[in-house]
């Protein structure tokens, strides 16, 4: 009689990796999950790089297209590329050095170019230099809405609960709050594209007891500690590149990632795996999230975030969402209409970077839900005359 999780494959089981944890290739009912192969019973399953399905620790999967196309043979993005649509070609990364980004040939964004079909191949209508090839006609069209968007992310693991002789990071599991505390960061990113600390609600600072500025008391310890939240720092945090995969909601133009109330993507990894992080209810809390996405501004995009703890969203390097501090789930949205375009310095047709910074700083619930509406870009469609 088959017993899922015992390490032996007996029909109707299709796999058995000796556990009943879904998301690792073999489901909790011992069915094979898409994008994986399970060759040996009782052993971990492995992802299938090149099948066009983003699975496991893959950072991209363009369906096994040619080398040097942006997604490597090990399913990691190649330098200078972004791979945000599973199963489709990666595209060149726009150049952003302040203000509007500069579109580059191959990024799939038709800005100041005769055409751009998202690749650097010749003989497909749009050349490697983004010129329309002889005997072809290229039109700028709204890109066909993909089923998913896969946005690159970097998680950084901090020690929230000390274990195994480790030391807790000062900003983790220290403070409390009953709602958002705005003003922890300035209104613009620094030259490295990272948030700038204000110290407004610093522990021991002049505003700690100021209920107008800091209604929930101190929220941070120091600039030196804050500057490590989104910077790789040996011995303090462990970085993990990944993707946040947003699913299309019907034909609404909306894409949603919902991590639920137990969003702890580094459980079983980082300091937890090294035995230096004490778990809370079996989960690894104490991490930050850095997510970036390029978009051509059309004037009707909507972003909504719902979660905890600190969340800051910048567009064009300017602060658009400010729900910092320790708090339970808070929801905030921003519509990039006329009023917001002036505030953020956005011009229709130009390319900008969306940068989201998040921190989970207290064990318990962890909520993370991101909704992007209208952020799918235009591209070129070329046809033979």
Where are these regions (language model features)?
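Acidic/polar, compositionally biased interaction segments
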Residues: 119, 141-385
């Amino acid at each position: 009689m088959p017993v899922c999780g015992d390490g032996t494959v007996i029909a109707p089981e299709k796999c058995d990796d000796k556990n009943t944890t879904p998301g690792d290739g073999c489901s909790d009912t011992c069915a094979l999950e898409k994008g994986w192969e399970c060759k040996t019973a009782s052993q971990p399953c492995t992802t299938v790089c090149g099948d066009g399905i983003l699975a496991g620790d893959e950072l991209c999967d363009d369906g096994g297209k040619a080398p040097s196309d942006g997604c490597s043979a090990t399913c990691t993005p190649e330098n200078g590329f972004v791979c945000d649509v599973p199963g489709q070609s990666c595209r060149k990364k726009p150049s952003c050095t302040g203000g509007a980004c500069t579109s580059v040939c191959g990024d799939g964004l038709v800005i100041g170019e005769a055409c751009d079909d998202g690749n650097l191949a010749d003989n497909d209508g749009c050349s490697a230099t983004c010129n329309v090839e002889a005997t072809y006609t290229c039109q700028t069209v709204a890109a066909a809405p993909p089923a998913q968007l896969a946005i690159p992310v970097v998680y950084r693991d901090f020690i929230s609960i000390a274990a195994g002789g480790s030391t807790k990071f000062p900003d983790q599991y220290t403070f409390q709050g009953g709602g958002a505390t705005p003003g922890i960061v300035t209104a613009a990113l620094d030259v490295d594209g990272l948030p700038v600390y204000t110290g407004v609600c610093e522990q021991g600072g002049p505003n700690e007891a100021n209920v107008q500025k800091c209604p929930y008391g101190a929220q941070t310890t120091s600039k030196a500690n804050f500057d490590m939240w989104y910077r790789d720092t040996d011995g303090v945090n462990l970085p993990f590149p990944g993707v946040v995969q947003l699913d299309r909601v019907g034909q609404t133009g909306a894409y949603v990632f919902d991590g639920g109330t137990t969003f702890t993507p580094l459980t079983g990894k980082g300091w937890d795996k090294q035995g230096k992080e004490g778990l809370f209810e079996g989960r690894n809390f104490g991490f930050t999230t850095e997510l970036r996405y390029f978009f051509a501004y059309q004037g009707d995009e909507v972003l909504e975030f719902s979660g905890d703890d600190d969340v800051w969203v910048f567009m064009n390097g300017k602060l658009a969402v400010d729900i910092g501090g320790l708090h339970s789930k808070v929801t905030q949205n921003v519509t990039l209409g006329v009023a917001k375009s002036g505030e953020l310095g956005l011009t229709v047709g130009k390319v900008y970077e969306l940068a989201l910074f998040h921190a989970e700083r207290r064990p318990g619930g962890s909520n993370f839900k991101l909704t992007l509406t209208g952020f799918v870009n235009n591209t070129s469609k070329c046809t033979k005359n």
